[in-house]
């Protein structure tokens, strides 16, 4: 049985979140949570929240045992980009791209 959780429009770039996602892909849930707890990046906090949501979904909706679950798949897609302007010297302006991501975690008991 598979259970899915998503966080859409997460305010962090997909490139940064993929570094964390690669660390826990395919691991058992307790080990993955341990890795995320000791990682001091903002992306680790975002991924941990989505993983905990997937665990809650599996326990509540499907009645699965949380300790037996494994991260079957985790992927990060690019979300929309907010464009902002930063004033510079001599009347010019630079563009700032505030990137977002869509985090998807799938846990399975197999």
UniProtKB/Swiss-Prot annotation:
InterPro entries reported for this sequence: Ribosomal_uL22 (IPR001063), Ribosomal_uL22_bac/chlpt-type (IPR005727), Ribosomal_uL22_bac/org-type (IPR047867), Ribosomal_uL22_CS (IPR018260), Ribosomal_uL22_sf (IPR036394)
Quaternary structure and partners: Part of the 50S ribosomal subunit.
One GO CC term, this protein: cytosolic large ribosomal subunit
Record's protein name: Large ribosomal subunit protein uL22
GO molecular function, one term: structural constituent of ribosome
GO process annotations (BP): translation
UniProt cross-references to PANTHER family, sorted A to Z: CHLOROPLAST 50S RIBOSOMAL PROTEIN L22-RELATED (PTHR13501), LARGE RIBOSOMAL SUBUNIT PROTEIN UL22M (PTHR13501:SF8)
UniProt function note: This protein binds specifically to 23S rRNA; its binding is stimulated by other ribosomal proteins, e.g. L4, L17, and L20. It is important during the early stages of 50S assembly. It makes multiple contacts with different domains of the 23S rRNA in the assembled 50S subunit and ribosome. The globular domain of the protein is located near the polypeptide exit tunnel on the outside of the subunit, while an extended beta-hairpin is found that lines the wall of the exit tunnel in the center of the 70S ribosome.
UniProt record similarity statement: Belongs to the universal ribosomal protein uL22 family.
Membrane spanning stretches: none
Record's keyword terms, sorted: Ribonucleoprotein, Ribosomal protein, RNA-binding, rRNA-binding
Highest taxon of source: Bacteria
């Amino acid at each position: 049985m598979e259970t899915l959780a998503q966080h859409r429009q997460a305010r962090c770039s997909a490139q940064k979140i993929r570094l964390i996602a690669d660390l826990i892909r395919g691991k058992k849930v307790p080990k993955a949570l341990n890795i995320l707890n000791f990682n001091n990046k903002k992306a680790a906090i975002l991924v941990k929240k989505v993983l905990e949501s997937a665990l809650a979904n599996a326990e509540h909706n499907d009645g699965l045992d949380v300790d037996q679950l494994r991260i079957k798949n985790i992927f990060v897609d690019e979300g929309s980009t907010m464009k902002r302007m930063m004033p510079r010297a001599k009347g010019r302006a630079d563009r700032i791209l505030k990137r977002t991501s869509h985090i998807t975690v799938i846990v399975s008991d197999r």
